[in-house]
Each structure stands twice: as C-alpha cells, then as structure tokens.
Amino acid sequence: MVLSPADKSNVKAAWGKVGGHAGEYGAEALERMFLSFPTTKTYFPHFDLSHGSAQVKGHGKKVADALTLAVGHVDDMPNALSALSDLHAHKLRVDPVNFKLLSHCLLVTLAAHLPAEFTPAVHASLDKFLASVSTVLTSKYR
C-alpha cells in the first residue's frame, strides 16, 4: 500500500504525539489483542499474560520500538524491518492474520489516548501505515 505525502505527514505527527508513551501503548494494544482475540495467546506460551505483567510491557516496548523504526524509515520500511520480517516468518512463524489483529488493537489504543488528534484523516493514514508494516513483516513468508 502506497502512503501519500499527507499520509506520511499524518503518521509522523500522530506518532510524535505518542512520545514517551509508546511502550505503554504497545503493551495496552497487546493486552487488548489477547483479550479480544484469545487465540493470539498461543504465540506467547512462556509469558505471564496478566494485566500489567513485565513480559507484556517488555514486548509492548518492542512493538513500539519497531513502529518507531518504521515511522523513521517510512520510505524504506522493507530494509528497516528486514530482520524483524525474517524473525516472524522463519523463527516465530506467526500467522500473518495476527498482524492485522494487532494493528486494529493499536488503532483502538491510539484513538483512546489521542482523541483530539485521531481525526478521520489521521485514522485512515495510520490504518494504511499499519497495513504497510504488516505487508513488510509478512513479505518473507513466501
């Protein structure tokens, strides 16, 4: 999915508003995903998935850091996320549908925390951005 200049601007501005809360929002999105889509828990059998667990917070920070990297390299996400794509495709073997589920939960989390900034245009841009990230992360599954 191609991001327009307006989409890129919206994504960078919205992610800039996330600021120091990125890890917190990443963890919240994971918790939402685990509650809304319980089958996603199967990829984390060794995690304490209870609310506020250190493992969920730690993985939420990893998710947020990867998204920060993608925002910073929005014009070259395939190269920036190559190692992460390899990891998910070849080692973790995560079902690609789970990226869509997490993307949805991220959008809900961002909308809850940034209601003034979460305009329809920003929502659409973030949705396109997360779809692009998902496409990159699943590109090595073939």
Curated annotation (Swiss-Prot):
Question: Which InterPro entries does this UniProt record tie to the protein?
Answer: Globin, Globin-like_sf, Globin/Proto, Hemoglobin_a-typ, Hemoglobin_oxygen_transport, Hemoglobin_pi
Give me the residues that bind O2, please. Answer: H59
According to the UniProt record, list the residues that bear N6-succinyllysine: K8, K12, K17, K41
The positions annotated for binding heme b are: H88
Q: How does it assemble?
A: Heterotetramer of two alpha chains and two beta chains.
Family assignment from sequence similarity: Belongs to the globin family.
Annotated protein name in UniProt? Hemoglobin subunit alpha
Q: Which organism is it from?
A: Macaca fuscata fuscata (Japanese macaque)
- Print the organism lineage: Eukaryota, Metazoa, Chordata, Craniata, Vertebrata
> Gene symbol?
HBA
